[in-house]
């Protein structure tokens, strides 16, 4: 069996923790094909070094707009969010979803100040979904699973890859070998496929 001590933090903070020796694995996510000059590329490239780090494919997942049941404001894009003045709830600096949002805003020709509530943030996908469910926000960007778990609607925006990063030197550790073997099993692949918005790599 593989036993994990899991700490939840944003993608950027997770990789920093890896580089500072505070963890063995760091999870982070990027678009399937991030542009070379994207904020994601500029954020993660300095933190990950070829030859020092190893990336392990973990999952594909969908990120999108988390909205109230029935999508009462008719939000289907970030343009809609900006144009409608919908109350948005963000993720904090250091989270991969904040990096993603800023990239998507730039692609859409939008600025942070175009989004009502851009400065308001919650620490997790679940907390964003809870804010929408409670009515303190109209919309946030997050994963489909968080929306479905709270009975909310979800508007897909992008496909991502979720990666696990480790140091090359950790690959021979028995626990790391066991984890990599587990990720290849059909049981794991089926479990991943059963989660809303997730798919195995």
List the predicted regions and their residue ranges.
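A ligand-binding cleft/hinge motif common to bilobed small-molecule-binding domains
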Residues: 29-44, 129-158
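N-terminal segment of the mature folded domain
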Residues: 1-76
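Short beta-strand-to-loop elements that line the ligand-binding cleft
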Residues: 3-10, 112-124
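Short helix-loop capping/hinge motifs at secondary-structure junctions, enriched
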Residues: 70-76, 110, 169-175
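Short loop->beta-strand "edge-of-pocket" segments that line small-molecule binding or catalytic clefts
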Residues: 79-99
């Amino acid at each position: 069996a593989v036993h994990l001590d899991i700490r939840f933090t944003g993608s950027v903070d997770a990789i920093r923790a890896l580089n500072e020796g505070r963890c063995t694995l760091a999870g982070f996510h990027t678009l399937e094909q991030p542009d070379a000059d994207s904020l994601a590329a500029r954020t993660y490239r300095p933190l990950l070094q070829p030859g020092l780090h190893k990336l392990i494919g973990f999952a594909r997942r969908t990120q999108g707009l988390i909205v109230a049941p029935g999508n009462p404001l008719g939000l289907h894009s970030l343009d809609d969010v900006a144009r409608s003045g919908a109350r948005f709830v963000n993720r904090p600096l250091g989270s991969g979803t904040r990096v993603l949002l800023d990239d998507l805003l730039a692609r859409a020709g939008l600025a942070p100040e175009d989004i009502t509530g851009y400065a308001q943030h919650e620490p997790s996908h679940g907390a964003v979904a809870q804010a929408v469910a409670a009515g303190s926000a109209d919309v946030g960007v997050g994963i489909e699973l968080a929306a479905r778990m709270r009975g909310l609607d979800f508007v897909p925006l992008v496909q991502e890859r979720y990666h696990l990063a480790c140091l090359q030197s950790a690959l021979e550790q028995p626990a790391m070998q066991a984890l990599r073997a587990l990720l290849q099993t059909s049981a794991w692949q089926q479990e991943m496929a059963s989660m809303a918005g997730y798919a195995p790599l």
